[in-house]
């Protein structure tokens, strides 16, 4: 623990306290700093106690909601305008009630609009830290000239307000470089890197029921796993194409060894690909993308099957299994029992799923770009003392060779890769490490 003269009063300001990756980071940071003895509260414009993390719903963290009565959009448009309006309302409440004077630090993330107001009205010793997950202006699709014109003032506001904070931190060295490339007027600022985390203090959230459900369902048949939201940006087709290519390589190799092929046919222990993740039938892209992935399987002669709910039965001929909207316990059981996690997003600025896999002693294959280069240590055959998986370009032919190579590795090497991954997460990506990094910066 870092040394402090006294515990501080710290307020987080976050737009919508749901269950996304940004919210997970805010909750972990808040709990970690609270465990260090600081007085913590989270201010937000929206928090549904039936759709939030347990630390929030249980009351472990204090949460104060202001501005939820204001709309989030107008006919599906103007999202950024209303996000700013809701945050403005929240900060006005802090100002007019005098509450803004109560804190030693404000930690703001996602939306930087309020920072100049906080600086103007907070007490003279108060400091504001901004946590930049990724520049908001790079997350927006500018599909028309009007949309580009509409974003101009908001992009300028983002750059100005971000630069007005006392401290800026980012979630990876990759995001740090993007920060410099995007905010040209802030080239005098050098953000510090504070990595997101996973909770390493508690046992991975599985139970005997979900573990048994997975093992009985697959009957000791090996499977590879891809976990992502069903969104096109997640590049899940890379996993499918790689798996299809690997299947062809395996068949070619098996034909040369008839006995091995016969064994696979008799025991039905052929490897499968499981694609699981966030899915909402109300979201058009989720529905469309799942259909597109199923069509891709058909084109590649991969028999695919979709299960919504409990794992009970699937045809033995299935190659690819889709599992939309699975529980946390089932997700973690799949991670623990898979041969290899296939992490396919091409421009991920960090990525929590690889950490979850490594914590569960599961090796990871990820694209060698962005955040995963900072979390996954590539196994090159000579670094078994530290490797945790594989990083490779997003070429499905190269991925297929790595998948097959890993599948045929001796068990001791697989175990060592898994142990390395868990140790790396505990040492570099724990909640205590996150809180300690923030605590050091604030002090």
Swiss-Prot record:
Enzyme Commission number(s): 2.4.1.132, 2.4.1.257
Keyword Iron-sulfur: no
Locations listed in the record: Endoplasmic reticulum membrane
GO molecular function (one): alpha-1,3-mannosyltransferase activity
Glycosylation sites: 173, 207, 304
Keywords of this entry: Endoplasmic reticulum, Glycoprotein, Glycosyltransferase, Membrane, Transferase, Transmembrane, Transmembrane helix
Pathway: Protein modification; protein glycosylation
InterPro entries found in the cross-reference section: ALG2, Glyco_trans_1, Glyco_trans_4-like_N
GO BP terms in the entry: dolichol-linked oligosaccharide biosynthetic process
Domain of life: Eukaryota
Catalysed conversion reaction: a beta-D-Man-(1->4)-beta-D-GlcNAc-(1->4)-alpha-D-GlcNAc-diphospho-di-trans,poly-cis-dolichol + GDP-alpha-D-mannose = an alpha-D-Man-(1->3)-beta-D-Man-(1->4)-beta-D-GlcNAc-(1->4)-alpha-D-GlcNAc-diphospho-di-trans,poly-cis-dolichol + GDP + H(+); an alpha-D-Man-(1->3)-beta-D-Man-(1->4)-beta-D-GlcNAc-(1->4)-alpha-D-GlcNAc-diphospho-di-trans,poly-cis-dolichol + GDP-alpha-D-mannose = an alpha-D-Man-(1->3)-[alpha-D-Man-(1->6)]-beta-D-Man-(1->4)-beta-D-GlcNAc-(1->4)-alpha-D-GlcNAc-diphospho-di-trans,poly-cis-dolichol + GDP + H(+)
Spans traversing the lipid bilayer: 80-100
Membrane topology recorded in Swiss-Prot or TrEMBL: Single-pass membrane protein
Family: Belongs to the glycosyltransferase group 1 family.
Job description of the protein: Mannosylates Man(2)GlcNAc(2)-dolichol diphosphate and Man(1)GlcNAc(2)-dolichol diphosphate to form Man(3)GlcNAc(2)-dolichol diphosphate.
Protein name (record): Alpha-1,3/1,6-mannosyltransferase ALG2
Organism in which the protein naturally occurs: Candida albicans (strain SC5314 / ATCC MYA-2876) (Yeast)
Name of the encoding gene: ALG2
């Amino acid at each position: 623990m870092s040394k402090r003269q006294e515990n501080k009063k710290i307020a987080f300001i976050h737009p919508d306290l749901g269950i996304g990756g940004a919210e997970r980071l805010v909750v972990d940071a808040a709990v970690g700093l609270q465990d260090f003895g600081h007085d913590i509260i989270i201010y937000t414009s929206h928090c549904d106690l039936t759709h939030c993390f347990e630390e929030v719903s249980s009351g472990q963290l204090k949460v104060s909601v202001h501005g939820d009565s204001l709309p989030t959009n107008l006919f599906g448009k103007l999202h950024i305008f209303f996000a700013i309006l809701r945050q403005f309302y929240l900060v006005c409440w802090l100002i007019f009630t005098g509450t803004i004077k109560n804190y030693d630090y404000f930690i703001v993330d996602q939306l930087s609009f309020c920072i100049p107001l906080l600086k103007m009205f907070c007490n003279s010793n108060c400091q504001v830290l901004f946590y930049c997950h990724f520049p908001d202006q790079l997350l927006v699709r500018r599909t028309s000239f009007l949309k580009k014109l509409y974003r101009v003032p908001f992009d300028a506001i983002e750059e100005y307000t971000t630069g007005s904070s006392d401290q800026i931190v980012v979630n990876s060295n990759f995001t740090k470089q993007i920060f410099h490339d995007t905010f040209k007027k802030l080239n005098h600022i050098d953000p510090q890197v504070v990595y997101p985390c996973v909770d390493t203090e508690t046992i991975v959230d599985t139970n005997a029921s979900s573990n048994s459900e997975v093992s009985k369902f697959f009957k000791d048949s090996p499977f590879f796993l891809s976990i992502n939201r069903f969104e096109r940006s997640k590049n899940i087709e890379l996993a499918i194409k790689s798996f299809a290519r690997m299947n062809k390589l395996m068949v070619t190799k098996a034909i040369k060894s008839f006995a091995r092929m016969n064994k696979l046919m008799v025991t039905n222990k052929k490897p499968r690909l499981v694609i699981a993740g966030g899915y909402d039938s109300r979201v058009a892209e989720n529905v469309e993308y799942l259909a597109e992935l199923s069509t891709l399987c058909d084109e590649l002669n991969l028999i695919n099957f979709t299960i919504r709910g409990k794992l009970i039965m699937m045809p033995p001929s299935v190659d690819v299994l889709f599992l939309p909207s699975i529980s946390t316990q089932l997700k973690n059981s799949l991670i623990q029992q898979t041969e290899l996690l296939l992490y396919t997003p091409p421009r991920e600025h960090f990525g929590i799923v690889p950490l979850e896999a490594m914590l569960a002693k599961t090796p990871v294959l990820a694209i060698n770009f962005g955040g995963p280069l900072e979390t996954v240590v590539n196994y090159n055959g000579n670094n078994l003392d530290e490797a945790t998986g594989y990083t490779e370009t997003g070429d499905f032919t190269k991925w297929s060779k790595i998948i097959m190579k890993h599948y045929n590795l001796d068990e001791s090497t697989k175990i060592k890769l898994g142990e390395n991954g868990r140790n790396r997460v505990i040492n570099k990506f724990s909640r205590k490490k996150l809180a300690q990094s923030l605590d050091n910066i604030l002090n």
